[in-house]
Amino acid sequence: MLATRALSLIGKRAISTSVCLRAHGSVVKSEDYALPSYVDRRDYPLPDVAHVKLLSASQKALKEKEKADWSSLSRDEKVQLYRIQFNESFAEMNKGTNEWKTVVGLAMFFIGFTALVLIWEKSYVYGPIPHTFDRDWVAMQTKRMLDMKVNPIQGFSAKWDYNKNEWKK
């Protein structure tokens, strides 16, 4: 009996299509993304809805005045009508931001931090450079490889002239 009651409650909860959801003891409206929304974007210049959804009394009067001849509207009234419909103008949208300074600053910070880590590693983590990197050692190793005639067809020894004891030109 208890199991059927629990399953019926779970089923009702899962099937219900209410708009309100309960969260932390209060009712929260879920956002319906199927409805048109306002966005300021250069590539989408005319949004589906106006910027201001709930008009004040003065804005409603201005909207009524808009229905008449536009030559009777002052410049400020036209700007107010524009601001009811749009949040930003194209000039305001195209205006550069200072975000690039933050990006460049953070990139330089991380590059500098990485350089400090590399300097610290070179000083304290890595040992001395091996003796096999010394020029004399490399010369002796090269001479040994030439004496052994390593890869004589296309490789290292093919570029050495054994008669003249010099590199081929």
Swiss-Prot record:
Protein origin, superkingdom: Eukaryota
Listed Gene3D superfamilies: Cytochrome c oxidase subunit IV
One GO cellular component, as annotated: mitochondrial membrane
Modified residues (N6-succinyllysine): 29, 60
GO BP annotation list: mitochondrial electron transport, cytochrome c to oxygen; response to nutrient
Cellular compartment(s): Mitochondrion inner membrane
Primary residence: mitochondrion
UniProt entry keywords in alphabetical sequence: Acetylation, Membrane, Mitochondrion, Mitochondrion inner membrane, Phosphoprotein, Transit peptide, Transmembrane, Transmembrane helix
This protein's pathway: Energy metabolism; oxidative phosphorylation
Signal peptide: none
InterPro entries: Cyt_c_oxidase_su4, Cyt_c_oxidase_su4_fam, Cyt_c_oxidase_su4_sf
Organelle transit peptide residues: 1-22
Keyword Cell membrane: no
Keyword Ribonucleoprotein tagged: no
Mitochondrial matrix compartment spans: 23-98
Membrane topology recorded in Swiss-Prot or TrEMBL: Single-pass membrane protein
UniProt topological domain (Mitochondrial intermembrane) ranges: 125-169
UniProt modified residues of type Phosphoserine: 56, 58
N6-acetyllysine modified-residue sites: 29, 53, 60, 67
Transmembrane region(s): 99-124
Assembly mode: Component of the cytochrome c oxidase (complex IV, CIV), a multisubunit enzyme composed of 14 subunits. The complex is composed of a catalytic core of 3 subunits MT-CO1, MT-CO2 and MT-CO3, encoded in the mitochondrial DNA, and 11 supernumerary subunits COX4I, COX5A, COX5B, COX6A, COX6B, COX6C, COX7A, COX7B, COX7C, COX8 and NDUFA4, which are encoded in the nuclear genome.
Function: Component of the cytochrome c oxidase, the last enzyme in the mitochondrial electron transport chain which drives oxidative phosphorylation. The respiratory chain contains 3 multisubunit complexes succinate dehydrogenase (complex II, CII), ubiquinol-cytochrome c oxidoreductase (cytochrome b-c1 complex, complex III, CIII) and cytochrome c oxidase (complex IV, CIV), that cooperate to transfer electrons derived from NADH and succinate to molecular oxygen, creating an electrochemical gradient over the inner membrane that drives transmembrane transport and the ATP synthase.
Record-stated family: Belongs to the cytochrome c oxidase IV family.
Stated name of the protein: Cytochrome c oxidase subunit 4 isoform 1, mitochondrial
Annotated organism of origin: Rattus norvegicus
